[in-house]
Amino acid sequence: MIIDLLRRLFKKKQPLKFSCGAFKDIEDDRDYIKEIEQGIDPKSINLLDGVNFKATWQSSTNACTGHAMSALLTILYAKLNKTDPLLFNYYYIYYWSRMLAFGSIKEDKGSYLRQTMMAVQKYGALIQEMCTLRSVYSQPKQEEIASANLLKIKSYFRLPTNKIYDAVLYTLIREKLPILAAMYVRNKEWNIAGKTGILKPCGSEDRSGGHAICLYGYDQSDDTILATNSWGELWGNKGFFKISRASLERDIMDAWTVGYNYY
């Protein structure tokens, strides 16, 4: 019954308003800007190839930063072990991201990508099956925090926004690293992408908010970036979608990745 209702909603002509939750982070002197090489030969790559990973659903929460970072960590671990990928609890990541950004989890208002990367560097990540957190207001137990400390990233870098397309291709193709990205959402365009699986400009609609996603590949055949979303498997191509160069360059807020020796 719920599935049928959702399918009917996605067939409506009026654009849907989506749950988002990413704030634009202003570049400052705290940042380590990723250095990139020019002239990367574009070729298709899919960091989720052979990995049994399903898109998640953030429901009506603003926890997209936690979901996107969880996907990034799964991809990193899959580089070490594709046959048995780990799923990471997004509520744990979202908890620490908000604590670092706002000092509280009283409000489910989203977070910043900087604090999301910082959260996993400082407090690690929890394997889903070992975690009791099941809502955006849950607090981790001391034993869970101790367990998460074993899975920390060593460093992270901001991608240069002024040459974001080249930076994304370099990071994905040359370094084979996933990217945590935030984009402005234009409801009509993202509603169309939910049906076609491709995000591209289709007008001058105002931006309605920011949304965090994970970039995991590049398709040379149509010059698009592959991305995971957190709006469930009924959206896009079973929860995944492609981003056109025009949309990425126009609506990118900020983007980050881990250092090459990430664990």
Question: Which role does the model predict for each range below?
Answer:
Residues 62:
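Short alpha-helical basic/polar micro-motif
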Residues 50-59:
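Immediate flanking context of iron-sulfur cluster ligation sites
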